[in-house]
């Protein structure tokens, strides 16, 4: 069996998160799961199910965040940097993330989770 090397951009789409205005109270306490890097550091888990706050459809529509389908990788890119989780529910994130939506025909989410965690120092550089 021959293994093929890929660049991350060849096996995944990478999306930034975004934050709805916190001045607009009706952007929050909705039904859309929303993650912050602090949520990942507080949970200290391989899997992400729920953050400390949800956003509303209005909040979602008001910013450039993307809905990340379940079973992909959330990677914090701001303090704290280099935290990873596999989202077990559809969710969106704040701007402190690079969200990695994998081509599952080419790679496995669990493999990529551990691969990225192992290479976190190279990613941070």
Please describe what each predicted stretch is.
Residues 1-18, 34:
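Non-catalytic DNA-recognition/assembly elements of restriction-modification systems
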Residues 30-46:
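Short beta-strand/loop turn elements enriched in aromatics
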């Amino acid at each position: 069996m021959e293994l093929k090397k890929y660049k991350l951009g060849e096996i995944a789409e990478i999306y930034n998160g975004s934050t709805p205005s916190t001045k607009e109270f009706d952007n929050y306490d909705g039904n859309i799961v929303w993650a912050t890097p602090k949520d990942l550091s507080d949970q200290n888990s391989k899997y992400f199910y729920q953050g400390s706050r949800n956003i509303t459809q209005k909040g979602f529509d008001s910013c450039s965040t993307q809905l990340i389908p379940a079973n992909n990788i959330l990677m914090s890119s701001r303090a704290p940097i280099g935290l990873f989780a596999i989202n077990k529910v559809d969710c969106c994130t704040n701007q402190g993330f690079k969200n990695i939506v994998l081509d599952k025909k080419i790679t496995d989410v669990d493999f990529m989770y551990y691969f990225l965690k192992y290479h976190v120092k190279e990613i941070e550089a």
